[in-house]
Amino acid sequence: SRGIQDAVKARGLKVTFDVQNAQADQSNLANIAQRFVSQEYPLIFAVATPAAQTMANAAKNTPIVATAVTDYEAAKLVINKDKPGTNVTGSSDLNPIGAQLDLIMQFVPNAKTIGTIYNSSEINSQFQVEILKKELARYNVTLVEGTVSSVNDVQQVAQGLIGKIDALYVPTDNIIASAMPVLTKITTPAKVPVITGEEGPLHGGGLATVGVDYYELG
């Protein structure tokens, strides 16, 4: 949210922000949404798909600007990306998955199997993996998927991938991003390079990415 706050200040607009962080907890998110509605704020800015969906469900009559949402249509936030037809609009963080796959192949040119780990309940993650599958058609490479439903699953699922993959691709995924230190404690000793969908997970031990600048996106 820092990007939009700085942009508003740079334009000399007098706006007060009520910034809340749900800490990736859905119950916290629902409570924040209800409080925002009760406060009757004129506009809600939501970061990431879960936040945007929760705000949209709670605030039917309040304009909502979202960011860090990969696919607004798949998330059922808009009817059409060109003509939203709802009270939601915003910017997309769809990452250049084809370029990221090319990056993997530069690091591991003889790779035969690439793994990916993601939250199977997060629509954005599913969408990215489907694109990855299509991009893999350009290479003679097999994809092995590992899915989680919470941070607690990451260690076991990651361990299950080791020995089966030559590299690991991590899409933009809220659960995996928060569990990168756990993930890379497993991949690093196994010498499995981790290419990430965006910059944030690099600080948790990812090797490299070609991605979106989230500050500029805001």
Task: List each language-model region with its residue ranges.
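Short hydrophobic alpha-helices and adjacent helix-cap/hinge residues
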Residues: 1-218
